[in-house]
Amino acid sequence: VLTLYDFIRSHPFPQKWLVDKLKFYDDKQNLNENIFVQVLFDYARMAVIHCLQLTENSVKMIQEIEKIKLAYEETLLYDKELLNELKSTLENKNWNEISRALKIIKFVALKRLVGYSDDPVKLKVIQNRKDVKEIIKNLTRLFFQSEEQCFEDLKTLRQIISELFELVKDFEERLDLAKNEKNVVDFGDLEHLTLKLLVCKTENGFEKTEIARSLSQQFEFVMVDEYQDTNEAQDLIFRSISDDERNLFVVGDVKQSIYGFRQAMPEIFLRRKQKYKLFDANKEIYPAKIILDKNFRSRKGILGATNFIFSQLMSNSIGEIEYNQEEKLSFGASYDEKNDSDVEIKILDISESEDDGMNVLEARCIAKIIAQMIGENYEIKSENVVRPVTYGDFCILLRSTNKHAADFVKELELCGIPSWSDTSNSFFGTAEISTILSLLKIIDNPIQDIPLLAVLVSPIFGFTPDDLSEIRVTDKEVPLYFALKKQAKLGDKKCRNFLLEIDNYRRLAATLPSDKLIQQIYDKTGYTAVVQAMKEGQLRLNNLRLLIEYARNYEASGYKGLTGFIRFVSRLEEQKADIAASNSISEGANVVKIMSIHRSKGLEFPICILANCSRKFNKDVGDILLHPALGPGIKLLDYENMRKYTTFQRDAIKLDIDKKAMSEELRVLYVAM
């Protein structure tokens, strides 16, 4: 409910969005005209066209080798005939016909071919055919249900989606009441309150209010940068305060739209770009577009490599824009000529090093490259001065630093190379913070085995494995806290002292604010002195002080008590909130920077190393998917067989989400290069 609530707030009229999406579940509509089915039809048509291309390529390849041609041509031509028939069926856009055609399609086996086991043509043809059969198998699964079964699912889905939407509406009303009582708003509220002042919803869209009309006369220009990252709500705000868009000046690059996870909609900017004609200074007809193709940051070789790669990869289908002459980068800077290349591609062979992870091997390779360039005094030109390269001139770019940066930091450190990562350590993941949070959790509720165990073995209390075995042997069936109490009654002083200390903290928690309680824990346990004796002790001490600061801010916000603070921290952990731990090295120091591509956007470094390029895409496989145009996609429950199953509606949504995700991944690569 919360996820859907957050998602629809990027739309200018969230309630209308819910009403519109529910209309997609009309079970009286012709199934072939259903919006989800249309998505599946389009996908299937493109998939079969791709199969035909693979098959035609195979037919062309075998023409050069007579024996392979004699063995394979007849079967491949038969495949082509089958695929053409399927393509014709798909063009009729009839669910039952397509479903039947896919169920009866049969591929015959290729004839046996002796003596060509390692021939690259043979291997490529076999692989192409495997790919074709896999695609057809996937299409058969997508269209496996009958029309009647689809309507049954549609009816069930309508009931569930309707209930979900009602829950979201109810949640919004209650949340708004709670916010009003506390006199607070969030960023989403500010957007929607602004929209309420500026526009009124009508049957055909919206109309400006008097306030908007008055404001639009006060601005000579409305200028917006990074417009490719706007959402529908923001776009409507900008349009409403402009003079019917005549004075609206927007700057953006669809190829650099990489914030889909924040509901950025590059298609908003793209529609403008496609609609407007090129600016003509002699006619001055508005709206118009100006192409800013000059690049003043990069050397010519980098731009050439970028243009070459993306002219092969980026299209309207994947990337959401055709990488044509208008989109190509033009060299605009002034750099001295140099002998070595501007771009190098390193291919790492991991076949002989399977014991180490790919991350570690890649990090080790990069560390050697940096060490070599530093050792050879590789020269760069910076601020019109030629000088030897330093550590601070290098930046390692990763798609995500959260999971992978640690390996790179470690390998660089082993080579004596100082580095800084934009995440370094997660605040909640540091040993000192994890220990104190576990202690707070058991002060709030001691019947929690995992945090209790973490506290017992921590430097604060120092229970050994033998101690724990003794405690657990006392009673294996009860929670650990009750086993501790039994052991204390048997005369175990260590257990008794621990329980007395926890009881004391529990009494303090009833009267003290959370920040004061944490300070009491530090003072009574001497934990601050303990962490200072550890490696990087000052950093650990800084983290403990940070925790008190977060607790103080929590109390100052109007919320009170330990229980609430623990819930607040748990939510931050669940949401993977970007809370950085203290770091001994600052971003501005002379160190190698390890950054996410998102973080590096807009920054400049003399030498960039783009790593982790072999990483697989992280496709969303959750039970519920959210699509800005198609709405939520959900799985259904088969109570009889106790299983979840997907539906044609969710399949359609997942296909389009995957396509958009691949487009965004391609744009992330573009930003990195």
Regions found by a protein language model. Name each.
Residues 71-74, 81-84, 88, 92, ...:
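P-loop NTPase Walker
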Residues 460-462, 472, 588-591, 642-673:
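C-terminal accessory regions
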Residues 169, 187-191, 283, 332-349, ...:
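Flexible hinge/switch segments at interdomain interfaces of large molecular machines
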Residues 164-220, 233-234, 365-384:
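Conserved helicase/translocase P-loop NTPase motor core
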Residues 570, 618-649:
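Mobile, glycine-enriched helix-loop/loop "lid" segments at the mouths of ligand-binding/catalytic clefts
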Residues 144-155, 171-177, 181, 288, ...:
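Short glycine/proline-rich turn/loop motifs
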Residues 2-185, 200, 406, 416-417, ...:
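Conserved ATP-driven helicase/translocase motor core recognized via long
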Residues 1-4, 12-23, 27-38, 42, ...:
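Conserved motor-region signature of P-loop NTPase helicases/translocases
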